[in-house]
Amino acid sequence: LELKNAWTGQNAKYHGQKQYKNDRDITQPLLQFGRCLVHMAVDTDEVYMTTKLAGKNTFFLPFNKGNNHGQGNPPNTGTMGEGGHKTSYLWQEVFTKESLANIIQHFVRLDGSSKDDLNKRTLFFPRYHQLSVVRNLVNHAATYGVGQTYLIQHSAGSGKSNSITWAAYQLIETYPISADIPGSKGIEQPLFDTVIVVTDRRLLDKQLRENIKEFSEVKNIVAPAFKSSELKSALENGKKIIITTIQKFPFIIDGIGDLS
C-alpha cells in the first residue's frame, strides 16, 4: 500500500500512483510481478489498484465503491453517524482475515501456464464492485435459496466477463445455510446443479466461453450449448457451467422441459 492524505497535500490518484510509477524500484524482489497479489494507492477518499508494476507504464484501476452512480466513494457516516474516512471499507471490510482468505481462494488468478513467460501472464484481482456483487449474489442465494431474481448493472469496460465468471464458479459451489430454504437438498449438497450463462451477442458468447474456460482449474466442467440436444447431453454428463446465446434460449427451455 502507498498511503497518502490531504493533510500533507497529497492524494492517491496523483501522488500515490506517481510514486509507484517513478520512485519504486520494480527490480526489487517484493515489487516484481507475481510476488504481491495487488498494489494499492490509498488516501482518505479514494483507492486505486494494479496487479503489475511496470514503471511509467503502470496502469491503475479504481477500487472505489462508487457514489450516486458515479466515481469515488460515498460519505462515511459511520454506524452511529459519527463519520469517518471514505476508504475505511478497505480495512474494515476487504482486509479482514475472512475476506482476504475468500479473495485468495475464489477470486485471485494467475492466467496462463507455468511454462509461459511470467511477464506475459495476467494476474487477476477483483475490483471492489466485482467483489461486492459476487459476494452479495452468493450470500443471498445461500440464504434465500433458488428462484430469486437479480439485476446487476455494469458500465462498459468495468469487467462484466470476470464478474459473470466469478459468480458462475462460486454459485456451483454454494451451499444453503439451511435445509429449509427453496431448492435445498440438504446443507451438505450444493444448491445449484448447473449454472447456465445466457448472453445476448455471439461475440460476447465467445468471449465469455473463453474467459470461463480459462478460469477453470478443473477440466470438463464447462460446455457450450447451441441447441436442446447439446443442453441435454451437457446436463446428463454433469457439466457444471453451460454457456449459450439468447437466440438459442428457446431450445434451452425445451431441453429443460424434456429432462424434467
Where are these regions (language model features)?
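Conserved RecA-like ASCE ATPase "motif II neighborhood" in helicase/translocase motors
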Residues: 239-260
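Short alpha-helical segments and helix-capping/turn motifs at coil-helix boundaries
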Residues: 21-27, 226-230, 254
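Short beta-strand-centered segment that lines the nucleotide-binding/catalytic pocket of NTP-utilizing
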Residues: 197-199
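Conserved helicase motor
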Residues: 202, 222-232, 246-251
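ATP-dependent helicase/translocase motor core
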Residues: 2-194, 203, 207-218, 237, ...
